[in-house]
């Protein structure tokens, strides 16, 4: 039961006794007579909404359909701004807990942890809102409608906003997105804690500079296999309250006026009942950028007819003229507004304050010790160890440590984008300094600038590094170089990274430190996207990818480097060796992209990440209907890596499949492990992925401990998507692989565990 329920019940009882026929409006704190049906909570929701709409003028209705709505004093409706952000913590609204950027959350492969993050964020959001309403404050970014999560597919490492996503895989993205939305929206049967929003619907991932004019051309197969599954999951499984349409066109129709995406798929096929909101000024793009309408009036009419309920921007004010010109009717506006107002009713904005348990959440939850500890845990589990030649974990009692690099003392590399603020930010330098023992020394110099050569030719850094027992170089990129159009002030390409390399001055600096240095050099890499780390991989004794790790990032990095916690993050994106391995940035076809369709050998493969311990996989068993196979012995190569194999078993079309495997910690350290299940289809006439992630579990194992991990594969998960975009389950052969990375030779060469595998036939 909701933890605030019993508090609310007591307050509600006393409030009702005191109020009699009047209720205290939670937003205005002014008496409102209960005789108005829209204020009568006992009436059906739709009846209340219709009653409220019936009391509005056309101008008032239209005003309620833009993000920054005016108050309607005669109805005691306050001003409200629909635009709030909470990508990895409440953003742009003051003090809040700052969790790792979503790409880092994805690296945890832990959807239950992400659900806890969503719960913490929405608790803080409600507490902030409650405090603001008491002060009669209705500022932007202070509401309860949050335009998050970003569940676009990170199909190309050049996209600057890929850091906001859960990576390149639709299965992982769906699970992480569903978990966050459920945490955000809460579990009360009557009220939403906050309203989440799935964005950017539906085929949107750069280039940033072209997003207001670009047409993403995508086949039915790629649309339904890659770009739509996460949105479908959030609508059907998480009951997400809102969907945001994107700036660009998809297959020649503007996403915010797209008959197929908004009506045929979202409303009719999926049965979406929530509201559709535009990205900010996307309706302006319809007549300016895409030139699909002659003017603002026609663009507003087109969007309304296609199902858009809320306009972030001012284009919808033209709906008044659209009615006058006969382009739309007031009845159409009423129908669209009704969908939108349902959200405000579900948030409790027209009910007595005491009726809603979420109104009792106190401000003490904001950046509380519990939330900071959660931020630290998420950051710990997000860090990905890419290389370790025995340099890690470090002892914390060496005589002298040296920390250097452009990002060691940077706050920006903790934050990513869409962030809040607080006084608890722990830089990587601060985290490292707090972990060494008294008597040890730690020196620090930034050494170099982020992305250009030093102005002064004098070098006082590399010599000090070489005289230290261990050097930690904190390098990579930051939000200055990648992000949303307009946010990345050092980016020459609107936040995208058209140069895949890390800044050359950083590579030269690392090389100079390593040359002739007998002591370990550890590279700590910050950033939100894949980058060319080939030289770093060669030069450094250990490489730790830390993403944008949030306010506790410094402590989490130190926890891992000094061995308090074993690294356990896994890559949610493929790191190509170079951009030459990829199609053009503007090509939205999946051929040659991501681990599922890229046949070139990457620098780092999807799902990869090392640990301080080692794991052994064994005893793979599959069963379904009459099928039972035990593939417990290691033999053969199926299809790209050695492992356990069994052949000749048969699964009937339409049956589910149970899979289990045993995982053993064969090393010296306690550690988490992310157990991953991949499918490879053979023998089908369809174009199929090389591999498809269909299951993952995060487990914790002490040295010598074993656990049996269970998966269930549904007929849907065993099916394929054909060229028409339809799910089919053909007769073919499926290889099932269970391990800790995508099962390729490159994964094994980098140190991944040997997977166990079996092959079944589907008939």
Predicted regions located by residue number:
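Glycoside hydrolase catalytic-domain context in secreted enzymes
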Residues: 18-629, 638, 649-719, 729-742
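Short beta-strand elements
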Residues: 746-763
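A carboxyl-terminal module marker
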Residues: 674, 718-724, 749-751
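Bacterial Sec-dependent N-terminal signal peptides
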Residues: 1-29
């Amino acid at each position: 039961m909701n933890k605030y329920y019993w508090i609310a019940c007591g307050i509600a009882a006393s409030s009702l006794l005191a109020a009699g026929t009047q209720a205290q409006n939670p937003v205005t704190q002014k008496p409102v007579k209960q005789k108005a049906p829209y204020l009568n909570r006992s009436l059906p929701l739709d009846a209340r909404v219709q009653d409220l709409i019936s009391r509005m003028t056309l101008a008032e209705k239209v005003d309620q359909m833009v993000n920054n709505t005016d108050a309607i004093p005669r109805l005691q409706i306050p001003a409200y701004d629909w635009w709030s952000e909470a990508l990895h913590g409440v953003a742009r609204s003051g003090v809040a807990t700052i969790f790792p950027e979503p790409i880092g959350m994805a690296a945890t492969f832990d959807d239950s942890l992400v659900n806890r993050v969503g719960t913490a964020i929405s608790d803080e959001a409600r507490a902030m809102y409650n405090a603001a309403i008491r002060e009669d404050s209705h500022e932007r970014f202070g509401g309860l409608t949050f335009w998050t999560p970003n569940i676009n597919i990170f199909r190309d490492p050049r996209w600057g906003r890929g850091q906001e996503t859960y990576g390149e895989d639709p299965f992982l993205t769906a699970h992480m997105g569903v978990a966050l939305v459920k945490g955000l929206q809460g579990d009360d049967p009557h009220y939403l804690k906050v309203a989440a929003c799935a964005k950017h619907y539906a085929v949107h991932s750069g280039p940033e500079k072209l997003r207001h004019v670009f047409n993403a051309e995508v086949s039915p197969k790629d649309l339904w296999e890659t770009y739509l599954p996460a949105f479908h999951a959030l609508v059907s499984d998480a009951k997400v309250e809102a969907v945001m349409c994107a700036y660009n066109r998809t297959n020649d129709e503007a996403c915010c006026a797209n008959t197929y995406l908004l009506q045929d798929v979202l409303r009719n096929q999926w049965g979406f009942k929530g509201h559709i909101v535009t990205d900010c000024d996307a309706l302006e793009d319809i007549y300016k950028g895409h030139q699909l309408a002659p003017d603002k009036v026609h663009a507003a009419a087109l969007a309304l007819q296609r199902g858009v309920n809320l306009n972030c921007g001012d284009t919808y004010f033209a709906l008044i003229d659209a009615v006058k010109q006969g382009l739309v009717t007031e009845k159409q506006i009423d129908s669209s507004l009704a969908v939108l107002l349902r959200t405000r009713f579900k948030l409790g904005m027209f009910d007595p304050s005491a009726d809603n348990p979420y109104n009792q959440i106190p401000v003490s939850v904001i950046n509380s010790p519990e939330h900071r500890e959660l931020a630290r845990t998420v950051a710990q589990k997000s860090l990905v160890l890419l290389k370790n030649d025995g340099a890690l974990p470090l002892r914390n009692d060496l005589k002298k440590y040296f920390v250097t690099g452009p990002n060691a003392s940077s706050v920006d590399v903790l934050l990513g984008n869409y962030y809040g603020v607080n006084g608890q930010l722990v830089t990587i330098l601060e985290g490292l300094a707090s972990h060494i023992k008294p008597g040890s020394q730690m020196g620090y110099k930034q050494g170099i600038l982020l992305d250009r050569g030093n102005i002064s030719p004098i070098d006082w850094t590399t010599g000090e590094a070489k005289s230290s027992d261990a050097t930690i170089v904190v390098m990579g990129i930051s939000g200055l170089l990648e992000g949303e159009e307009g946010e990345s002030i050092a980016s020459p390409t609107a936040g995208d990274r058209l140069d895949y390399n890390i800044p050359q001055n950083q590579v030269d600096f690392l090389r100079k430190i390593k040359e002739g240095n007998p002591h370990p050099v550890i590279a700590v890499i910050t950033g939100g996207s894949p980058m060319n780390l080939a030289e770093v991989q060669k030069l450094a004794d250990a490489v730790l990818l830390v993403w944008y790790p949030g306010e506790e990032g410094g402590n989490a990095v130190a926890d891992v480097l000094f061995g308090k916690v074993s690294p356990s993050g896994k890559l949610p994106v493929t790191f190509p060796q170079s951009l030459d391995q990829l199609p053009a940035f503007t090509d939205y076809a999946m051929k040659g992209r991501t681990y599922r369709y890229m046949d070139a050998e990457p620098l780092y493969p999807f799902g990869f990440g090392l640990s301080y311990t080692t794991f052994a996989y064994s005893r793979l068993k599959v069963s379904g209907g009459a099928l039972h196979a035990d593939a417990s012995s290691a033999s053969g190569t199926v299809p790209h890596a050695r492992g356990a194999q069994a052949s000749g078993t048969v699964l009937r079309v339409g049956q589910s499949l149970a899979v289990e495997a045993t995982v053993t910690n064969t090393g010296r350290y306690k550690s988490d492990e992310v157990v991953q299940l991949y499918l490879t289809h053979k023998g089908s006439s369809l174009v199929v992925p090389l591999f498809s992630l269909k299951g993952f579990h995060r487990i914790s194992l002490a040295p010598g401990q074993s656990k049996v991990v269970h998966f269930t594969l549904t007929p849907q998960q065993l099916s394929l998507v054909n060229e028409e975009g339809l799910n089919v389950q053909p007769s073919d052969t499926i290889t099932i692989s269970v391990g800790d990375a995508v099962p390729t030779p490159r994964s094994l060469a980098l140190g991944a565990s040997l997977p166990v595998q079996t092959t079944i036939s589907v008939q």
